[in-house]
From Swiss-Prot:
The keyword Cytoplasm applies. This is ATP-dependent Clp protease proteolytic subunit 2. It comes from Chlamydia abortus (strain DSM 27085 / S26/3). It catalyses: Hydrolysis of proteins to small peptides in the presence of ATP and magnesium. alpha-casein is the usual test substrate. In the absence of ATP, only oligopeptides shorter than five residues are hydrolyzed (such as succinyl-Leu-Tyr-|-NHMec, and Leu-Tyr-Leu-|-Tyr-Trp, in which cleavage of the -Tyr-|-Leu- and -Tyr-|-Trp bonds also occurs). Pfam families: CLP_protease. Keywords: Cytoplasm, Hydrolase, Protease, Serine protease. The gene is clpP2. One of its GO terms (molecular function) is serine-type endopeptidase activity.
Amino acid sequence: MQMTLVPYVVEDTGRGERAMDIYSRLLKDRIVMIGQEITEPLANTVIAQLLFLMSEDPKKDIKVFINSPGGYITAGLAIYDTIRFLGCDVNTYCIGQAASMGALLLSAGTKGKRYALPHSRMMIHQPSGGIIGTSADIQLQAAEILTLKKHLANILSECTGQPVEKIIEDSERDFFMGAEDAISYGLIDKVVSSAKDTKDKDTIS
């Protein structure tokens, strides 16, 4: 199994130096990173971070940076519902890619505060899954996939302003977009090349 090295940073707190992992340091600036496949463990971590930041300051913006190929629908929807549950604005940023559930989470940010860097790529498609078991099991799982397909299309329609029928049609196959195309589609609001281009003036303190 490939191990990912998590960098540590050292800060001078006035009472000596303190080391912390990079994600904890970013959390101090209300920055949450989704930088891998969206799994249940990742979703639980992201949700805990979001709820912690809400408890610290229920009015101050939270920044969510996304570089993800997508992942499990239930995990992604758990993060989506949490974003909508928060009382504060959530600024979403696509860096690299936001595919599948990653694209849905990108679009779920506060309208006017959904961003992508210039060379980012976004992709939407219909849900898929390996179906095994008895014929009755296969029927049930196929019906669930169709239900999720309509459910996700409704969410994307609400977030982007596109008709549900267009979302369903475009999602039949992998539907890729560049940053400018994503603006036209309604996934994001602005392409930014610098933190100064956003409405959030304190992206990193």
